[in-house]
A protein has these predicted regions:
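Short coil/turn motifs at secondary-structure junctions
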Residues: 37-39, 54, 87-89, 117
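Terminal substrate-recognition subdomain of acyl/acetyltransferases
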Residues: 97, 101, 105-117
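Acetyl-CoA-dependent GNAT
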Residues: 1-47, 52, 71, 103-107
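Conserved acetyl-CoA-binding loop-helix of GNAT-fold acetyltransferases
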Residues: 51, 57-70, 97
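Conserved GNAT acetyl-CoA-binding A-motif
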Residues: 72-83
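Conserved beta-strand-loop-alpha-helix junction that forms the acyl-donor binding cleft
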Residues: 81-92, 108-113
């Protein structure tokens, strides 16, 4: 995996269930966590994506999401998935603009999916 190490710090952990990554912008503008769970061989789950408030609207979230896609593709995954709280409708719309769609509706969350192939 080739990622600009001057711009991002990447930490990975291997677990009995798979591997997870934490990707942090070195300038502190944002962080994302992704999981590769062996029980879901085609899917990369985005555990959380956060951008500090004063950096929002500057492409930080998009760049972190693009890194998730890059890693997922390199790992041979077919889908990216994530959950969005129902009380954050603006995030649902943002992820839709990034190519995700609502796959299922849970009690308090929307499960969203993006096809990578």
């Amino acid at each position: 995996m080739v990622i600009d190490s001057d711009k991002y710090f990447i930490h990975s952990n291997a677990w009995w269930w798979g591997v997870d990554y934490r990707i942090i912008r070195r300038d502190g503008a944002g962080i994302v966590g992704i999981n590769f769970d062996n029980s879901m061989p085609e899917t990369c789950y985005i555990e959380g994506l956060s951008v500090v408030e004063h950096e929002r609207g500057k492409g930080v979230g998009r760049s972190l999401l693009e890194l998730c896609e890059l890693i997922a593709r390199q790992e041979g995954k077919t889908f990216l998935s994530l959950s969005v709280e129902k009380d954050h409708p603006w995030l649902v719309e943002w992820y839709k603009r990034m190519g995700f769609f609502i796959y299922s509706i849970e009690d308090h969350t929307f499960l969203m999916i993006k096809c990578l192939k």
